[in-house]
């Protein structure tokens, strides 16, 4: 009789059926948090069945945000959920796509590694997928082998694209043994309003489709807008051949951070550790209960305007939104994110209309010229009103453009938006010029991942971080043009952080005597924020917004600001001295 290999690491697969967007990622993340709170070492992985190598070149409206890991991988937004709930950094291996798998297999075929074989989906593609799944069980940098690997399989059961991944997962159970592998299936139990009934047939059919490919789920997550009664849970357990203890009702929760409590109430974590024979302790709720108190018992509310291009699809700014909320948790404050389309801020009147009742303005990252003048207009409005501003990546670049325009460089722009501008205060990075020119691959070639920065002592950012040595994740091709540092200084904007060699501008800010809080960073600090450990920049920004709200500023009348385009000089030699510097003095908090 064949014996299965001894496996110190257990594997748990999360699949989905009936419909997409049921919350597989949040379910997997919440279970990971529960197992971690039981003292287990957990890591996570997402299998994405699209042919792109990574999501880096996808439209944010289609895919949502691109989450960048410490090692510079562009990954699915669910990896961000994993990091936030587990409170640990993951690597690029946490996201596997069909594009990656096929690229590797085809490259091996070209090198002759399959010499003599007909390369097929089974076994070559599935073997490559299995290899990437099993690699997650290897010890990490601290030589700690995970107790559990949770692997989320993207898509829904029945999709053609997902079949190789489901087959690979089935083979992992065959290779490691049923005692070492757990299948969790997330399914929809719809409520039909006309009849007032909950219907179980979609879940039954979804499980039947899963069983037809050789996978019998150990537990079912029933997604519904209300609790599923015991009678229906018993029916589903019978018809789907699942232990009744593994039929888990998960009604919609008030907050995503309540989901671990919902799963624990249904005893899913206890069922998993028993089934996989894992050592465990009781759940330590100390940290999570403190978080939930801050989530549900805020002492006040602040309104933060997120001025972006993709605000019609909030997942495009998921990590930014979560970092803002986490910054609020630190202050026992609820952050209400006001989604503002950047196009609405292109004129002073438009900016005043949409930003009149907010307490802070956040300018997120992005690409392309659409909406840029609106982001700059929002910064101009916030500067004059004394509104706190935080600029991320492109947001820093917009702060620099607005600052240099205010001291006479009215054609100041980015080489990304206006290659022929006479004053490219934002320029293409030297190692990106061939890529921008179309002479090299576009995907996966930006300045990606964690890079160090040195902060100026006593600066706002140094005070926020509590140190002058920091590391942040990046994703950009453009940088502040060092030839314009004197013009930046003339505007009052201070370069408060650079790369260790002093070359690349990483942080800018206005001194407190000019404005209470305008900070820009070339990085994406939102990617390192955790609900239980908010990022210090977001803590400082939300704190400044709370101060702004508390100050009860008197109205400040802003002089009419002419549209820049109406006053562009005819010659590039005229723009520095031919425009009156009439930018209104920034307001100070009273």
Curated annotation (Swiss-Prot):
Binding site for ATP: 21-26, 78
Coiled-coil region list: none
Residues reported in the UniProt entry to bind CTP: 20, 159-161, 199-204, 235
Protein name, entry field: CTP synthase
Positions that bind Mg(2+): 78, 152
PROSITE patterns associated with the record: GATASE_TYPE_1
Annotated metabolic or biological route of this protein: Pyrimidine metabolism; CTP biosynthesis via de novo pathway; CTP from UDP: step 2/2
A Pfam family hit: CTP_synth_N
Organism placement in taxonomy: Bacteria, Bacillati, Actinomycetota, Actinomycetes, Mycobacteriales
Positions of the catalytic residues: 393 (nucleophile), 524, 526
């Amino acid at each position: 009789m064949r014996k299965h290999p001894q496996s110190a690491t257990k594997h748990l697969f999360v699949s989905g059926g009936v419909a997409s967007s049921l919350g597989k990622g949040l379910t997997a993340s919440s279970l990971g948090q529960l197992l971690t709170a039981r003292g287990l070492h957990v890591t996570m992985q997402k299998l994405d069945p699209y042919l792109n190598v990574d999501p880096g070149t996808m439209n944010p409206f289609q895919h949502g945000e691109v989450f960048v890991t410490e090692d510079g991988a562009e990954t699915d937004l669910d990896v961000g959920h994993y990091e936030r709930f587990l409170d640990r950094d993951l690597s690029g291996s946490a996201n596997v796509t069909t594009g990656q798998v096929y690229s590797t297999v085809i490259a091996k075929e070209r090198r002759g590694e399959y010499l003599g074989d007909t390369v097929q989906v089974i076994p070559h593609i599935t073997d490559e997928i299995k290899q990437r799944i099993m690699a997650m069980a290897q010890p990490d940098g601290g030589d700690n082998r995970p107790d559990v690997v949770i692997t989320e399989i993207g898509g829904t059961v029945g999709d053609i694209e997902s079949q190789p991944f489901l087959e690979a997962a089935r083979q992992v159970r065959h290779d490691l043994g049923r005692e070492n592998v757990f299948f969790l299936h997330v399914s929809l139990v719809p409520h039909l309003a006309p009849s007032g009934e909950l219907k179980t047939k979609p879940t039954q059919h979804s499980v039947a489709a899963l069983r037809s490919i050789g996978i019998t789920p150990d537990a079912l997550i029933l997604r519904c807008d209300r609790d599923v009664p015991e009678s229906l849970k018993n029916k589903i357990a019978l018809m789907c051949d699942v232990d009744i203890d593994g039929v888990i009702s998960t009604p919609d929760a008030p907050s995503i951070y309540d989901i671990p409590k919902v799963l624990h109430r249904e005893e899913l974590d206890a069922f998993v550790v028993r089934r996989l024979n894992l050592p465990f302790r009781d759940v330590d709720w100390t940290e999570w209960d403190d978080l939930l108190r801050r989530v549900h018992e805020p002492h006040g509310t602040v309104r933060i305007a997120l001025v972006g291009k993709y605000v019609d699809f909030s997942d495009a700014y998921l990590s930014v939104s979560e970092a803002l909320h986490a910054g609020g948790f630190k202050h026992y404050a609820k952050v209400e994110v006001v989604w503002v389309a950047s196009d609405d801020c292109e004129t002073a009147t438009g900016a005043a209309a949409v930003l009149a009742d907010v307490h802070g303005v956040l300018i997120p990252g992005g690409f392309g010229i659409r909406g840029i003048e609106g982001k700059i207009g929002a910064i101009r409005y916030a500067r004059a009103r004394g509104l706190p501003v935080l600029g991320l990546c492109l947001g820093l670049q917009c702060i620099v453009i607005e600052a240099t325009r205010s001291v006479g460089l009215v054609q100041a722009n980015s080489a990304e938006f206006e290659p022929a501008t006479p004053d490219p205060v934002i320029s293409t990075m030297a190692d990106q010029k061939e890529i921008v020119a179309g002479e090299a691959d576009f995907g996966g070639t930006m300045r990606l991942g964690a890079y160090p920065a040195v902060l100026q002592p006593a600066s706002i950012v140094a005070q926020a971080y509590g140190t002058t040595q920091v590391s942040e994740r990046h994703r950009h091709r453009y940088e502040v043009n060092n030839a314009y540092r004197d013009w930046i200084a003339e505007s009052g904007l201070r370069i408060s952080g650079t790369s260790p060699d002093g070359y690349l501008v990483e942080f800018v800010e206005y001194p407190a005597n000019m404005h209470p809080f305008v900070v820009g960073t070339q990085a994406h600090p939102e990617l390192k924020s955790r609900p239980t450990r908010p990022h210090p920049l977001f803590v400082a920004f939300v704190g400044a917004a709370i101060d702004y709200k508390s100050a009860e500023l008197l109205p400040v009348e802003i002089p009419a600001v002419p549209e820049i385009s109406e006053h562009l000089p005819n010659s590039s030699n005229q723009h520095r001295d031919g425009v009156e510097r009439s930018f209104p003095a920034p307001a100070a908090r009273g």
